[in-house]
Amino acid sequence: STTLLASKSHIANVTGTDISFTATGSEYKITSTTTSLAGFAVRDLITVTGTSNNNSTFTVKTVSSANELIVEEIVTTETAGSSFTLDHTGFVSDKAKGDGYYSQPDGVHTVSYQVNSTMTGSIKMQGSLATTPTEDDYFDITGTTFTADQSTLISTANFTGNFVWVRAKATSVTAGTISSVLINS
């Protein structure tokens, strides 16, 4: 099996009046002067609230410094001043080669999710048919969603498709840890 995700925990919200948004060409930044953004990591999903123009969910593309994130999605330039909150609501795993990458005819995959007893949120698989996918190329794979209920700690799903790439996506995460996501293709 391939490990898509080893261990990932929910992190606390970040709130600040010095957080701003900048769009320069095709680079989209969330920055601050003193509020630390260092807790966020590449592929984290952060939901922004309190802004005039950027209340949305963004995928971290690069952590440039403790005070600067580059995100995948388009931001609207907005200066600091009001209190903005960045809520860590999930993340996506690194991509793994699916059966379509190897031109396998059966397309059968099995995924295993393991979480701790305080985990809240959902995990699902996404696939892409693109050879070099962007965020927009991924789609949810039917029948792979696991919603944590604090009692089921391991869940599995089988799915079929000749996906070139597959990855896991965790959403609505408010607490707890995903211990691992494993896949067999």
How does the language model describe each region?
Residues 91, 97-106, 139-185:
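Beta-sandwich interaction modules
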Residues 2, 132-145:
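Tryptophan-centered short beta-strand motifs
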Residues 28, 107-111:
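Structural beta-strand segments of beta-rich domains
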Residues 1-12, 87-106:
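Transition segment at domain starts
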Residues 32-34, 111-115, 168:
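Aromatic/hydrophobic beta-strand junction motif of beta-rich domains
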Residues 47, 122-126:
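Beta-strand signatures of extracellular beta-sandwich domains
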Residues 126-132:
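Conserved Ser/Thr-centered positions that define the repeating blades of beta-propeller domains
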Residues 8-42, 47-91, 150, 172-178:
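Small/polar beta-strand repeat architecture
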